[in-house]
């Protein structure tokens, strides 16, 4: 019995093994066992069905779908299937663990980046707050500076008002000084212009008329008048009162005449203070035979007559001043040298008397392009007696030149006669003027620490030192060079 039982168990086990559905090694999830059991069930059911052939025909996979069944070598036991499933699950577990670790590392990296970004953001916020605070402080400072600027502007505006007043006063004083210097230049240049022998009235006060003057040429009847040598009107006090001088003596030197002309051309306001000065210049009926004085007298009368014919006079304020008598005497001395040579050439003089005018007024004509009319200046009563005209038949024409060439020539003669000296009379003054500007440079060179390659000397100080050493010879050479043209001009005037 026992043997039969064991044999039946083995047969049943063999049948079970044979009837067990095939499990492939590739099927890790056991899907093949389910399909085999379903197939076996369907086969069992097919035995009871009335049409077993058709069911068997359609239940075979090879017949229906063309899929070959797996080989018996690939079939696994359930234990092997479990082991395969366990291995597969372990592999998946390892994969998930690896992925989890990767995710953890990524999370850590992101956390570190986030922390860094937070720190950077905090720093940026701190900088932004600091910038805002600095901006607020800067705005406060700007407001304060604006307030300071406004206060300074207000103070400057107040001061500018006072400065403008000062500038106006200074301009007024400058204008007065310009008129004074202009009149002094006229007084100095009058004598130099009168020494020229080639011009008819180049050095006379008629030159001081404006360039827009219509009367540039005057005839003898209009300017000087037709007077005979024996005409009593030549010695009348009414006609002689126009020049503003008193006739007292018959013997008058050329010096007095030139001094009178310089005073008239300089525009001196003849008042009570100058009465004694004017009374010293007396014009007589007889004058020495000098062409210089002849031109001077004719020019004076022509200038006065032109101003009367135009009937244009503007009363303006004039700055009173006292001319330097020393300069006038020096000019007169130079004129005497020229006049003494020409004294013997002319034996007769051409008088130029003027028409009747107001005896209490004299006209001062100033040189300049800006003035358009002469200025009348009140003077004391005086008379004038011109010389007797020995040649009354010839008309005398006075031409008032306005060309620039003659003015430049006259200016050149004055500059040649008056050389400028850039050195003083004392040697010590010139020495100090050369040496003193170099003292700060020398002191700086002595006290400062010189670098390598820096020159010891300064070019300006070196030049001043050379000039200091040769100052004596330089002064002598410059004086000689300035003295030569003056001597040459003096010699030319004597010739």
Curated annotation (Swiss-Prot):
One GO biological process term: vesicle fusion
Lipid bilayer topology: Single-pass membrane protein
Sequence positions bearing Phosphoserine: 200, 204, 219
Chain ranges passing through the membrane: 427-446
Keywords: Coiled coil, Membrane, Phosphoprotein, Synapse, Synaptosome, Transmembrane, Transmembrane helix
Comp. bias (Low complexity): 7-49
Phosphothreonine modifications at: 214, 235
Recorded coiled-coil stretches: 79-161
GO cellular component, one term: mitochondrion
Transmembrane is among the record's keywords: yes
Pfam family, one: Syntaphilin
Residue ranges with Polar residues bias: 207-217
Region (Disordered): 1-74, 191-244
InterPro entries listed in its UniProt record: Syntaphilin/Syntabulin
Keyword Cell division found: no
Localization terms from the record: Membrane; Synapse, Synaptosome
Complex formation: Binds to STX1A. Interacts with DNM1; this interaction inhibits the binding of DNM1 to AMPH and DNM1-receptor-mediated endocytosis.
Primary role: Inhibits SNARE complex formation by absorbing free STX1A.
Protein name, UniProt field: Syntaphilin
Source organism of the structure: Mus musculus (Mouse)
Encoding gene (name): Snph
